[in-house]
Amino acid sequence: MLSRHVTDSLALIRTPFYLYDMELLDATLRSAMREAGRYGYRVHYAVKANFDPRILDRVRLAGLGADCVSGNEVRAAAEAGFDPRSIVYAGVGKSDAEIEYALATGIGCFNCESSQELEVIDRIAGRMGRRADVALRINPDVDPMT
């Protein structure tokens, strides 16, 4: 709950604006990491949720990885100081330039949406003399009957 002093101060600020409760964010991140650690899970923050550098810094300091779905998100995570190996790059329509940047940065993994994308990443990685770790999304065409 916000104090009267805070709400009075907020009344003086032009809108719209964002107000982040960094203490709550830190507590939530600690809780997520503590629970994930009990099972050996790795937690990645969806950068698309909010790529404000102050948020990304807190997320990085808490030990989470970065889940990115665009080249700009990969760049934001790298510039925020995430360990490149903790950056995962998913999403469709990755450009050659975005793939090159991700490879040069040394990201942990590409999530590939198709065999064609896998071939493009392989070609670019080969040309750059890099190794690309990938996860390939497979659609087994099974009706889950849901």
Residue positions per predicted region:
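A charged N-terminal "starter" segment
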Residues: 1-126, 130-132
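Active-site loop/helix belt of alpha/beta enzymes
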Residues: 140-146
